[in-house]
Amino acid sequence: MSNISTDLQDVEKIIVLDYGSQYNQLISRRIREIGVFSELKSHKISAAEVREVNPVGIILSGGPNSVYEDGSFDIDPEIFELGIPILGICYGMQLLTHKLGGKVVPAGDAGNREYGQSTLTHTPSALFESTPDEQTVLMSHGDAVTEIPADFVRTGTSADCPYAAIENPDKHIYGIQFHPEVRHSVYGNDILRNFALNICKAKGDWSMDNFIDMQIKKIRKTVGDKRVLLGLSGGVDSSVVGVLLQKAIGDQLICIFVDHGLLRKGEADQVMDMLGGKFGLNIVKADAAKRFLDKLAGVSDPEQKRKIIGNEFVYVFDDEASKLKDVKFLAQGTLYTDVIESGTDTAQTIKSHHNVGGLPEDMQFELIEPLNTLYKDEVRALGTELGMPDHIVWRQPFPGPGLAIRVMGEITEEKLETVRESDAILREEIAKAGLDRDIWQYFTVNTGVRSVGVMGDGRTYDYTIAIRAITSIDGMTADFAKIPWEVLQKISVRIVNEVDHVNRIVYDITSKPPATVEWE
């Protein structure tokens, strides 16, 4: 299996070197909001490799390391000699200070560790153009810079940090001790915009319209006269991929809709009617519910579920592809967040993603992932740009493994039915309350926990259903949605009264992090 992903070599970009910060993906996202493409790169990247990528700017992210410790994340010093503007954030500022001859002291030695919001006072600088001389920023550091490198000047201070911002304007190297990428830094977006547009001289013309043109050319060049298989789940991601591919290669696209028995209520019919009917996609429906459920029988481990579903999904594709000629490619709706969440060299794997892990090495296809550089909100914007209606573009996200990862423990038909019916009620009531565009994602989970209840005059011992609803911008971080109590109460009453084998409803009030969006 080979992987053909989005080629962005010719796109003007700013790269973010990943030093393990919990915020490093947000840096990339904020730069994109400015209209400049941005992506994460390993901190191990060499100067020669940076030259090949040809970015207009480089950002060194924050991170948990200390520059004076053995094994701390480093940087190729030749990167500083490439003539490319550089912005170091938090650990990134400490690292560039350390490498260029300044001094960084351990936490506490200088008595100036800072955690939380602080007031930054700055002097004139291209980085702070059109921002107030005093502004609120988020600090999160223990170590501190006490001496700056030669040819650098101090441009910002705070009450506990004498070197909150430094720069070498001649070499276009900048360092800031605070985090401009988070909303707590009130003028953070303006600072990043100054770096991207004024210092790096980026044009700011990254858009979904440009992305469509670029992707269509790339897809046509890659595919040639061969045929492409796409797995349709009915979700936003695969639907957008389908419309994009059809626009690029027309009848060369064959969509396979695998009904694995793990779909939401009425979803199979909706997929066939919506994408096969309205958009005219060539869809082959594979009824494989028994095949999947037999393989999943007795399996409780979430990672094993994902691997089984990933394998079986592709094997079904193999079966369908064997009936066709000139099928060379398999398309997937993998997003940038999927790739990040499956682990980098600075972070442990949280969980394998269904579009990243679980694919057998002997699969017959080459993999095409047209969306694997995009965040979720960018995919929705892409769908709108492609002419897709809101009810498709804003459809609730649904994972490839389907309800298998919304049923805790072993999967049974009874558990699946409780999730299907409760989820349908949740979606209906959220829409009635006018909250369906305000809440980023919402669904129900069979927790696998049974509890005692009373219905009528009888004792019950039935399942507990959890409601998960979150607000987010890009899926990298999320807060639980503050759904009005009266709406939650109505949902709870309906589920308990209308769904068999359920007698208790709980609401998940955990943010991401520490939790992920899905329960498994």
UniProtKB/Swiss-Prot annotation:
Gene symbol of the encoding locus: guaA
SUBUNIT field: Homodimer.
Enzyme class: ligase
Domain (Glutamine amidotransferase type-1): residue spans on this chain: 13-205
Domain GMPS ATP-PPase: 206-395
Metabolic or biological pathway, per its Swiss-Prot or TrEMBL entry: Purine metabolism; GMP biosynthesis; GMP from XMP (L-Gln route): step 1/1
Source species of the chain: Streptococcus pneumoniae (strain CGSP14)
Positions bound to ATP: 233-239
Record CDD domains: GATase1_GMP_Synthase, GMP_synthase_C
Annotated HAMAP family: GMP_synthase (MF_00344)
Protein name: GMP synthase [glutamine-hydrolyzing]
PROSITE patterns: GATASE_TYPE_1, GMPS_ATP_PPASE
Pfam families named in the record: GATase, GMP_synt_C, NAD_synthase
UniProt-recorded Gene Ontology molecular function terms: ATP binding; GMP synthase activity
